[in-house]
């Protein structure tokens, strides 16, 4: 028997690799259905009528394909929101209607929350939110989504509906807008930050120059977005090792600096000491923000003015900022002084000021570790 030619071998390798991945995707989604309360929602919707359907969509499908941890589950259905409510009532599943005007009902089972969104088509947009009509067309719903990698649906058996080849883009490392990129951005300017997040997480290629031009042309539209949504997206971008990836991509970094000019210390992360590098993934978002914005000026106060965070987090950030503005030397970190600081401010505050000193030092003194 003749050995396959090189081009044929490459084709066969890719074919069997994709086939194996499809088996994994199917098995993983079946596992999620069987081992989480999602199975009750699938049963409630699928049994509502002969034509009712429900599928996994968006981030949970994307994460399964990339073999990432699935931390939340979004669902799409061809039922209207009122029909979804009726279907859930029939199975005694609790829900609330907070997002009903946008087509989303949130089901609650065993303290788990599942967003169930009706298929939609956009009627009008204002750069923040869209006015929608409900639809029965799965492809029409997919066409209004932002990126091909987020327009992949899957039923409870793991069968994919992928009208824009999002799975292929995801596996090959392409971040492609659906349709006209500028139109997609102008529908919701938060998509600029979402593009950066997905690019940093999944792309294997340089930015398309045309996409960067479009983003820069429309970047002022970010001012239309609420501070809560901006902070939420920044948190996702900087989670895990996203910030370290950002520092290696100059175009992404420049865009982040335009959108968040308060992050004045961001380039300092290029020269972290060895201890800081080793422990970087252990720090939480608010402490990360302290490292990014506290610089001895009113910058931290300005950040808190621009962006809404909880009062508890505000207090924590202000405490680190106040401490930094004092004339702090290594002698400040004596056991006596730290005990006094602990007495007035608590354990977390002591940890924060020590870590803040460590992360802002070129080398780390043993007495701080």
Question: Could you tell me what each predicted segment is?
Answer:
Residues 3-369:
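Catalytic cores of the polymerase beta-like nucleotidyltransferase superfamily
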């Amino acid at each position: 028997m003749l050995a396959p030619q090189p081009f044929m071998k490459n084709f066969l390798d890719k074919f069997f690799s994709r086939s194996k991945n499809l088996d994994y995707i199917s098995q993983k989604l079946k596992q999620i259905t069987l081992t989480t309360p999602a199975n009750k929602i699938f049963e409630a919707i699928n049994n509502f009528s002969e034509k009712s359907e429900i599928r996994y969509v968006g981030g949970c499908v994307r994460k399964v394909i990339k073999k990432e941890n699935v931390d939340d589950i979004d669902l799409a259905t061809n039922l209207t929101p009122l029909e979804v409510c009726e279907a859930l009532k029939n199975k005694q599943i609790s829900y609330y209607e907070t997002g009903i005007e946008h087509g989303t009902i949130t089901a609650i089972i065993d303290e788990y929350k599942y967003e169930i969104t009706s298929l939609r088509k956009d009627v009008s947009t204002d750069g923040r939110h869209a006015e929608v009509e409900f639809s029965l067309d799965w492809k029409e719903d997919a066409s209004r989504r932002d990126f091909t990698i987020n327009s992949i649906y899957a039923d409870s058996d793991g069968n994919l509906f992928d009208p824009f080849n999002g799975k292929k883009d995801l596996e090959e490392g392409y971040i492609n807008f659906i349709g006209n990129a500028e139109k997609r951005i102008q529908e919701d300017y938060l998509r600029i930050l979402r593009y950066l997040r997905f690019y940093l997480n999944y792309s294997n290629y340089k930015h398309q120059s045309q996409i960067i031009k479009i983003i820069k042309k429309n970047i002022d539209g970010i001012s239309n977005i609420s501070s809560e949504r901006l902070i939420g997206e920044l948190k996702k971008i900087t989670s895990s090792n996203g910030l370290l990836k950002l520092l290696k991509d100059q175009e992404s970094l420049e865009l982040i600096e335009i959108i968040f000019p308060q992050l004045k210390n961001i380039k300092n992360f290029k020269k972290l000491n060895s201890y800081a590098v080793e422990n970087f993934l252990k720090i939480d978002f608010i402490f990360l923000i302290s490292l990014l914005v506290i610089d001895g000026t009113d910058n931290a106060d300005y950040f808190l003015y621009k962006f809404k965070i909880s009062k508890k987090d505000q207090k924590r950030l202000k405490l680190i900022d106040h401490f930094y503005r004092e004339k702090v030397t290594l002698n400040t970190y004596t056991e006596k002084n730290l005990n006094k600081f602990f007495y007035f401010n608590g354990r977390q505050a002591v940890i924060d000021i020590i870590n803040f000193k460590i992360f802002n030092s070129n080398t780390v003194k043993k007495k701080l570790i």
